[in-house]
Amino acid sequence: MLVFKSTMECSISSTIHVLGSCKTSDDVNQIHGRLIKTGIIKNSNLTTRIVLAFASSRRPYLADFARCVFHEYHVCSFSFGEVEDPFLWNAVIKSHSHGKDPRQALLLLCLMLENGVSVDKFSLSLVLKACSRLGFVKGGMQIHGFLKKTGLWSDLFLQNCLIGLYLKCGCLGLSRQMFDRMPKRDSVSYNSMIDGYVKCGLIVSARELFDLMPMEMKNLISWNSMISGYAQTSDGVDIASKLFADMPEKDLISWNSMIDGYVKHGRIEDAKGLFDVMPRRDVVTWATMIDGYAKLGFVHHAKTLFDQMPHRDVVAYNSMMAGYVQNKYHMEALEIFSDMEKESHLLPDDTTLVIVLPAIAQLGRLSKAIDMHLYIVEKQFYLGGKLGVALIDMYSKCGSIQHAMLVFEGIENKSIDHWNAMIGGLAIHGLGESAFDMLLQIERLSLKPDDITFVGVLNACSHSGLVKEGLLCFELMRRKHKIEPRLQHYGCMVDILSRSGSIELAKNLIEEMPVEPNDVIWRTFLTACSHHKEFETGELVAKHLILQAGYNPSSYVLLSNMYASFGMWKDVRRVRTMMKERKIEKIPGCSWIELDGRVHEFFVDSIEVSSTL
């Protein structure tokens, strides 16, 4: 506990020093009490020093104390008509505009104006910053009007602040009006507008302004904005490449933007060419290349680069794990996670866990799922976002709907994503009635379901044979929530009708769909035709499927099985022969089983068993 020695003179410097060493709000309150008791708090030099030293402190309890001192000993004691330098006011406005409640900056500006305190360009620029953070365009426009009434309108710095505010609030037209009316512009004016156009996808407008920009004003920010904008589109990568070549100087952002553009559009060799010759690389460079190789399926190339990295951070580990998960190397992803903890001593972030949990889910390792959940609880990760969704999904796919429900019930502020994950889990476990009840709960709580909610409920109804509930859900989606059905919704409805034996209704729905049915819907319908002995319809569907997706083995297998169910062995042999001639092979089934802490992998028609930790 921090205390003053009774014999110590409470000088201003020592007070500031002791305040700076405070670890908690209780420490600050104790010192505040002592300052009041000794009367030193009335010293304006001390209060000024406190405000200037701590108003923008990263320690909330110190920043709050500084603001409190300012309001109590400066604002409340201020006399109207008294001339006061706005410097101290600006320090507190800055504290609010960059802090957790930017609205206080606006209130403080109003207080300055009411009390006749001189307002300068720094006061206004800080309040414009607060308006930007709040998306409060109306407040920005009021300040814009105030500038015109005072003599500050011609200040280039404030004009640039207004452009930035309008762009941040999505008012591209207002920012361009502001830009066009400026009698004088600098590189900040041009760069702000160019960046605004790029972020809105208006690369042509950005290029027009870039070409109008005086050459002496163009700097790295200007060039990098244009390269980044062009690199986002497939037809703009080559233009970005030409701009990159024409740049008078390049920095790391220039190289990374160009590499990112190549990677995004699958041009990994071009990206590698730049990667090999660039003078300096950072973690972003390496992570971008790893991600690019992984997305193209070149996981081993990605791992080679990962192993070559001189320094790895969480982003690099996340990229490698995500690459493994995308390519279904789930065990390898878990090994990378283990290496991250044991070798690098890096702490995983939310993104790390959102990548790792689906890997565990795909392996179905309940023991590993429980261990990971305990780890998340121990490290006090927040489950209100994507992590909670991934945790529910993991338990559902690992076979424990009870654990999934416990996680779901323990999340206080549930978003629709949490409800969707729980409904999806209930669907996996064939608990259609519970899933439908959850939809009714969502309705009662006045939450807004989305298209994924209805995919989950329809899927659950399909697995549980709930025809009436499925039809009700479909109508609720369309009529009440005005959600246009997508292929997934139609697929679920075809499955619901087909499973119930309503082949004709399912056929009519397929024919009336406003979108072209995909092969999944046709295969669902074909399976139902086979099951319900609708031979003629099924044969037509199968032949259509083979024409539409001629190299998908499941279509041939379904047709063969249907012929077999009718004892048409000659036709079965004909389909099998067709598969051989076209070199179409069934994808072998694979299963995992966890035994004594090891996962064993089994493949159909294989006597070998692979195992891993």
Curated annotation (Swiss-Prot):
Pfam family, one: PPR
PROSITE patterns: PPR
Segments annotated as PPR repeats: 85-119, 120-154, 155-185, 186-216, 219-250, 251-285, 286-312, 313-347, 349-383, 384-414, 415-449, 450-480, 486-516
Keywords: Chloroplast, mRNA processing, Plastid, Repeat, RNA-binding, Transit peptide
Location in or out of the cell: Plastid, Chloroplast
GO biological process per UniProt: chloroplast RNA modification; mRNA modification; mRNA processing
Listed GO CC annotations: chloroplast; vacuole
Region (Type E motif): 521-596
GO molecular-function terms, A-Z: RNA binding
Additional observations: Unlike other RNA editing factors, CCR4 does not contain identifiable E(+) and DYW motifs but does contain PPR repeats. Therefore its association with DYW1, which lacks PPR repeats, but does contain E(+) and DYW motifs, is required for its function in RNA editing.
Family named by the database record: Belongs to the PPR family. PCMP-E subfamily.
Known partners and oligomeric status: Interacts with DYW1.
Function according to Swiss-Prot or TrEMBL: Plays a major role in chloroplast RNA editing. Acts as a site-recognition transacting factor to recruit C-deaminase. Involved in single RNA editing events. Required for the edition of the site 1 of ndhD (ndhD-1 site corresponding to cytidine-2), which is a plastid-encoded subunit of the NADH-plastoquinone oxidoreductase. The interaction with DYW1 is required for its function in editing the ndhD-1 site.
Protein name per its UniProtKB record: Pentatricopeptide repeat-containing protein At2g45350, chloroplastic
The encoding gene: CRR4
